[in-house]
Amino acid sequence: MKYSLDTNIFIDGFRNEEAQAEVLAFLNRALPFTYLSAVVMQELCAGGRSADVVRGLERGVFGPFERRRRVFAPSSAAFVESGRVVSVIAASEGWQLFDERPSFLNDALIAASCREQGITLITRDGDFKRLATFVKGFRYALPWPTPTANIQ
């Protein structure tokens, strides 16, 4: 099984020592099966707020995945599928797409690209439950203690 950590898992690890220990323990067990989404990389850089923080991400987080060639990016088909999914959900729920849920676009893109790669997303973000009903074959799991016990 292949895994990818969602942005919220990394952020939790940056903000909290206990969460950081959980992330590191997971990576120690599952690193040979773990990939990094280019969309997650973009979100982490956008939240970095300084060149020093972004350089730290590049060295400490992105670099190990890049050296192992374990970074994946969405295909053009994933972009189209995620756009269609967001359009359907936005219309059915009556939201102004970019005003009310801008991060949902990236979530849909992550879901579609994980599905393409056969990767299970490890996340705490509840939006992925809804996305899983629209992105057929997409799998996600809650992070701890063992993600494989929570695969949806």
Residue ranges and their predicted role:
Residues A51-R55, I89-A90, F138-L142:
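Short, hinge-like loop/turn segments at secondary-structure boundaries
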Residues R69-S75, Y140-P145:
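Short acidic-hydrophobic, aromatic-tinged amphipathic segments that line or gate anion-handling sites
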Residues M1-S37, A46-G63, P147-N150:
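Short, well-structured N-terminal submotif of metal-dependent ribonuclease cores
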Residues D6-T7, L44, S82, C114:
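Generic structural signal for small/hydrophobic residues in well-ordered secondary structure
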